[in-house]
Structures are given as structure tokens and as C-alpha cells.
Amino acid sequence: MRGRPLLFPSYEADSAIFPSTTKKVAMAIFFLVALTLPLQLVPGLKWLGENVWLVILGQALIFAIGALGLNILTGMAGQVSLGHAFFMGVGAYTAVVLGGEASNSLVGLGLPMWIWLPAAGIVASLTGALVAPTAVRVRGLYLAFVTIGLVFVGDHVFRNVRNVSGGPGIGRKWPPIELKVWKEETSLLNLSADGSWFGVDVSRQAKQFVFLVVVSSLFALAHKNLARTRIGRAFAAIRDRDIAAEVMGVNEVRYKALAFALSSFFAGAAGALLAAFFGSRVPEAWDLLLSVQFIAIILIGGAGTTAGVLLGSFFVVMVPRLVETFTGWLADLTGETGPLSVVANFILATGPADFGLVGTTPVGPGLSVFQLNLVLYGALIVLFLIFEPLGLFGLWLRIRNYWKGWPFTY
């Protein structure tokens, strides 16, 4: 309404996905920047158009799809799950069985992506529906232990079904990201090789990044729309007060099972895309650490929110790269003189007799970059749970509300 932008005249206007012109313009700018990022046309962000960063951003988009699925179960329905990696593995191996190439020791049907990608989500969803009757009978800590058990069961199965997974430490090749009608040799759109679009030379990383922007946006839109439907309101009622929700007529068992199935669909699709994006994956990759990363994403980003999950995905995926870059910069400073060199020598342990937080040698003292990332994940989860339960999205709300209320503080 003109002059009253925050006044919604109807329920439909209040529950719209993009309720204001500002949000619509912001989303349009975001898509414009994202789709032109590989062309390195955006001032100040040209470095993100390099292939190494496009791979990192592509992984973040895939993680966002998986995290949106976990957010349905944990953020919307309030059910704690540490078994997300298991459902991602189910989706990944469904994809490789349907789309992978067969050999003397490996199973593969060679079907196109428009079959194996939806099938990965569907099979993972059916697996989640099979697990749900057992999982919905418990809650809280007991539910967490049940879902942890899925990860260890999956790890055992993935390692030993060698004609599907390729075996521990070996893995197998996943089907490429390309569009075909059926099993023909040439593809309609090959996203796994360098080429040209509209006369412009683009790398495979750029092609896959644009594809993942589109796919992840569709999943984010579905996630956002789910929150405002009858199913989403039932999830929120169960999360906030499950007994009261059941008294009011919400079928708790049915909606919890539905939350597991929907969450598993997102996880299966994300697992298939992740394995195809990197080309191969060993069975050990679908472990508990992967599940913890997704827990970190929704807690750091903001549980129950779409924007928070997207922020958390980019944050968690980019932290290891930023830590690696930061430690490399500190290592360059250790041989120089000055206050920065003193700080670098204090933080880094460059020799066996040094004392430092981060080690630069595989067998020396200090934490490795991988271990430091785990410490950062844990510390950030604790800090956000204590000081800002809504995560990065909560910080954004504080900044936005301060800006809207300035110069007043109330």
C-alpha cells in the first residue's frame, strides 16, 4: 500500500515469498550478479569468477540444497538429525547406479541426468520414509543417537557393496553433469567440459556454477514456499509444542514422517550433485563429519530460515579456503621483520621445537588446517547458540532493524 509499505491488506500479501519491492529488487540483483559472476564483469568481485572460487561456490550451492533439507527436519519440524550424510550417500549411489558406466566389477545403466537426479532424491526420500516409523517414536537425544546409527550402518554398507561404491579408498567415477535425451554419445548441453555460450568461451566450472545457481534457486523456492503452506505450519506447531499441536488435530506421526521424507529428498539430490560435481567420491566421504557440517550450517546461518541456511552454507564452505589463505599469508610473514612477523611466529609452528596454534608441517606441533576448521566449527556453533540463536540471519535482522529505526534506538 502506497505510503504504508509494511501494512499488508490481506493474508496472501503477508505470506508472499517476496512481500516487498525491496526484496524483489534485491533478488533480481542477486541473480544478475550470480549469473554474470563467471564472466568477471562485476567490479570488486572479479576474483570470485576464477575457476578455483567457482568450484568453492558451486560446492556451497550444493551444500545449500542439502542444508535446506536438514532445515525442513530440524529447523521447521524441530527434529534433531545427525544422519543427513547417510541419505546423501543413498542419493549419490542411486545416481551412480542409474547414470554410471558399467564394467566387469561395477554396476551402471548409463541413463541421462534427467532420470538419475530426480531418482536420487526419490530413493533417498523413500529410505527416509522407511526410517521414519522408528525415528518418530523417539525425540531429543534419543533421536540423535538413532540417526547417528544410520551413518555407521551406511558407512558399513557403502564400503562393502563394492560393485556400487567401488570399494573403500578407491571409489568410482560418477556420471557427468550433462543433458541428454537418452544414451546417445553427444549431449544436448555438456556442462562437464569447456566450451562456448553465445560466442563467449566459458570453462566447465563456469557452466556448472550457472547450472547450480538455477537448481539451488528452485530448491530454495520450494523450501521457502513449504514454510507458508499447511504442511509448513504443521511442522512449526510440532516444533514449538508437539503435545499442543496433537491436541489441536495435527497428526504428529504423519507430519514427522513427512518431514523425514522431504528432508531426505533434498539430501539425496544434494548427494548426487556433490558426487557428480567432483567426479568421484569414496565411501568414507559420507561420514559423521559431513553430518556435523550440515548441523553447523543451519546453526551458524539460522535454523528455520531460508536466507540463513544459504548464508551458513557459503560461510561453512568458504571458511576452510579462507583459513588456508590466511595461514599461507602468515607463513610468508614469518621470514620478515616487524610486528606482523612477531604475530605470525606466535600463531604458526614452523618447526618441531616451535610453539604455535597452527602447524605448517604434517608431523610438527600445532593444529593442522583441517583440525583448525573443526575447532572453528565447534566454537562458532557454541557462540551462536549462546549469543545469537538465529545465527547470521539474526545478525542481519539486527543490522536491518537498526538501520530502519535510525536515529532512534527503540
Language model feature labels by segment:
Residues M1-Y410:
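Transmembrane alpha-helices and adjacent helix-loop boundaries
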